[in-house]
């Protein structure tokens, strides 16, 4: 038995030594490409790349974002806090690691009145002041912007939809968050769709710019703007496919220079809860959205 154990340890040690040698070779500081194979094949182009091994690379896969908002919970000293962020490595500047400021906000905060938007200097609402503070700070720190809009008021303490939409005759439903009654338009309502498209058109005119915007996350419908558990005017899911076609067509038409994202999950535009949804329907919608130019993302992962 002892002999078997000794042989096993000996074999393991040899494997570790071999692995160590391999790793040492792979991590060599010699940057000159060495090969005994000739790539000089007719029609090929040879490209030699010298690896950068010492400089910090920011967020290589671009999946990690710096979350922010423009609602009442946002701090006006946001940048001071994030430039002096306590971490396990000591005080760090968050923008040294991330390259995207992700701004989530209620449609009503982005668009408080018809034709009035937070990026207009004439708009002096508190959300507008927060928005401009965030945008200016992002520019100073060489960060691009990303956005999610929220049209559904459930779980909110104020209406996510601007008042002028309801005043224009859009139909919707009322829910209660704590002691506050909030109103949400039905996503299949034609007046809501007209007004939301007008907002998206104005937003795209300003932010369909790859030098400024990293991505725009669709669609803004359902809980948290993430297409969860929608309530349609019919009381069932009959409008689901038509709403999908409408919102994907609008966003793919307006955002032609920056990535548009779809929140992928089993409840996509469904009126049902998680366990009751048909995953095949959601999977088909994801494929169709991708065919229209959408990318995939999930707020659980960035």
Label each PLM-derived region with a short phrase.
Residues 40-84, 139, 217-302:
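Catalytic-core regions of glycoside hydrolase
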Residues 87-177, 240-258:
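Aromatic-lined substrate-binding rim segments of carbohydrate-active enzymes
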Residues 171-237:
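Active-site groove signature of glycoside hydrolases
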